Swiss-Prot record:
Protein name: Ribosomal RNA small subunit methyltransferase G
Primary subcellular site in the record, as a coarse category: cytoplasm
One GO MF term: rRNA (guanine-N7-)-methyltransferase activity
Domain of life of the organism encoding this protein: Bacteria
Protein localization: Cytoplasm
Length: 208
């Protein structure tokens, strides 16, 4: 299975160390093993290569933007089974990642993975987003919901000059969502995620 990860990463021109591939391999295997117990991903995607291509690769496509902005800490909202937070933390060990997940089941899984993969740069926050009081310079979210459902709540957690990086799908749908929230932010930028293994994906950067 590590050979599959190595091939996929090479196709996307990702830089990696073998120890990181081992962690990703173990992480995917744990999702497959515990999916039924913790309700981590949909059954239609519950095979190794689907998780690798649809979730791991997709999560990593945001890392160049993170390195470009270079925040010291990142809040990942609605981390679920750990996409993108766990994946980013594996390859970005110099930064602190706060993974916010309200579901007890999923946050329990995240705590298990944090320990097993020895991710010292990860902290799991198990509560509703409305309880979070800390301000962040960078927030990630990878959700199927429309941006207008969470834009204001997340904006209130941003430091001045901070930004939200939302993983999104088709560009035409993004335009509709952006028009609904454009007055909330000083600048909105859409970045196309070009990858052989990731179809029609974009990042939306919302600047406070």
């Amino acid at each position: 299975m590590i050979s599959d990860i190595e091939f996929a990463f090479s196709e996307c021109n990702f830089q990696f160390a073998y120890k990181d591939l081992q962690k990703i391999n173990l992480y995917i295997k744990r999702i497959l093993l515990l999916n039924t117990r913790f309700n981590l991903i949909s059954n239609s995607n519950s095979n190794f290569n689907s998780i690798l291509n649809l979730h791991v690769i997709d999560s990593l496509l945001g890392l160049p933007t993170i390195k470009e902005i270079n925040p010291s800490e990142i809040l990942d909202v609605g981390s679920g089974s750990g996409f993108p937070g766990i994946v980013l933390a594996i390859f970005d060990t110099s930064r602190k990642y706060y993974l916010l997940e309200r579901s007890k089941k999923k946050s329990t899984f995240l705590k298990m993975i944090k320990l097993e993969l020895d991710l010292e740069n990860v902290k799991i926050l198990e509560y509703e987003i409305e309880r979070e009081k800390k301000k962040y310079e960078f927030i990630t979210i990878r959700a199927f919901r429309s941006m207008n459902e969470y834009a204001l709540v997340l904006k209130n957690l941003l430091k001045n000059g901070g930004l939200i990086m939302a993983y999104k799908g088709k560009f035409d749908k993004i335009n509709l969502e952006v028009n609904q929230i454009k007055d909330l932010f000083s600048k909105i930028e859409v970045k196309s995620l070009n990858s052989k293994l990731s179809l029609d994906r974009n990042l939306v950067l919302l600047y406070r």
